Amino acid sequence: MSDSSSRERALAVQAFDEWPPVLRALFDGTGLAGKEGFTACLVVADADAQGPLRTSLLSAGELYAPDSRSLAFALWPAARAARMLDAAARRGSGRAALTFVHEGAFYQVQLRVDALEVEEGGPLACFIASIDSADAQQVGYAKLTSGITFELQSQQRQAVIDRWQQQIERLRRAVASRSQADGGAASP
């Protein structure tokens, strides 16, 4: 095996504990129509590690990075992952993994999660997480072109994008409110 073929087959892993600029831009809550097909997978384990793992698929309209080390996200309150995270966060043990494909790399981000208070009557369960550890993985011989993706139905596309923008605004307000209450810190 030659040196060049070894390099092509080698797994390149880039560890990070802050969002790289390309991911900050992905999770900045702007230009949601252009991020329509993006999907991230949130994997949540039961706090006692005895129950099944739960997975939620999240769009760019449900993810917001208020700073370089945090991620706010919204789930439907009836989702099992939301209920598990809420219970674990109340015990101080909320943990999840966010996985996704972006620009040819597979990302896996380990998160410490806390519940995020939102205005009364909000339709979503909101959370704030800090990056515990993360990495991006690529190989030289193959480029990931997509992970799980979706396409909005044309007759509902604008309504969904408008809803995403409202969700991001709720997350922004909740993060700002928490940050003020904590004296400027957004992370759990």
Can you say where each PLM-predicted feature lies in the sequence?
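Binding-site signature for planar aromatic cofactors or substrates
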Residues: M1-P188
